[in-house]
Amino acid sequence: MVEPSRPLDALNNARDKRVIVELKNGRQYIGKLKSFDIHINVVLENAEEHVDGQLKRKIGTAFLRGDTITVISPE
């Protein structure tokens, strides 16, 4: 029998992989998921900020607050 997947398990499987994080304001951050906590605060490495699908700037390390995140998906 297969155990149901939990959201934090899915994030744990995405650790050290590139993800797309979309915020409530519509901005997207793409980078390697380094860490997260139970509040879904996330740290991305080699992060890039995208606005309206266009690269706005390269950030490096970014901390994104969980209550601003709407979607996290693999790249």
Protein language model regions, located:
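Conserved RNA-binding domains used in RNP assembly and mRNA/RNA metabolism
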Residues: 1-75
